Amino acid sequence: MIQKNTLLDVADNSGARKVLCIGLLNGKKSASVGDVIVVSTKVVIPRGKVSKGKVYKAVIVRVKKAVRRLDGSVIKFSSNAVVLINDQGDPLGTRVFGPVKKLPFGLFSKVMSLAVEVL
């Protein structure tokens, strides 16, 4: 579960490495996989597509909290990770690193197609 002031890893090659959650767009106090959040970049690599301190939207692709599926299986990851997106929902980077949990159907198909592994 992600809430305000959570430090997250970035799972794409947009140039950001760490971001801070500064707002939730789902109207609740916490967000999970597939939710869109507002983030501020904290750690960036030189000559990347993003700048330090700028505000972006991001979709959550991995959470540490165990998520139960309908068939009874449980999935949890070792880190909280996001992919930076633009206003249309397309990713800013061209690659997505690490596994990605299935996102809501039709909303982030571009992010899922770039992922190495979809669980």
UniProtKB/Swiss-Prot annotation:
SUPFAM superfamilies membership: Ribosomal protein L14 (SSF50193)
InterPro entries reported in the protein's UniProt record: Ribosomal_uL14 (IPR000218), Ribosomal_uL14_bac-type (IPR005745), Ribosomal_uL14_CS (IPR019972), Ribosomal_uL14_sf (IPR036853)
Pfam families documented for this protein: Ribosomal_L14
Keyword rRNA-binding: yes
Cysteine disulfide links: none
GO MF annotation list: large ribosomal subunit rRNA binding; structural constituent of ribosome
Superkingdom of origin: Bacteria
Function in brief: Binds to 23S rRNA. Forms part of two intersubunit bridges in the 70S ribosome.
Subunit record text: Part of the 50S ribosomal subunit. Forms a cluster with proteins L3 and L19. In the 70S ribosome, L14 and L19 interact and together make contacts with the 16S rRNA in bridges B5 and B8.
Protein name from the UniProt record: Large ribosomal subunit protein uL14
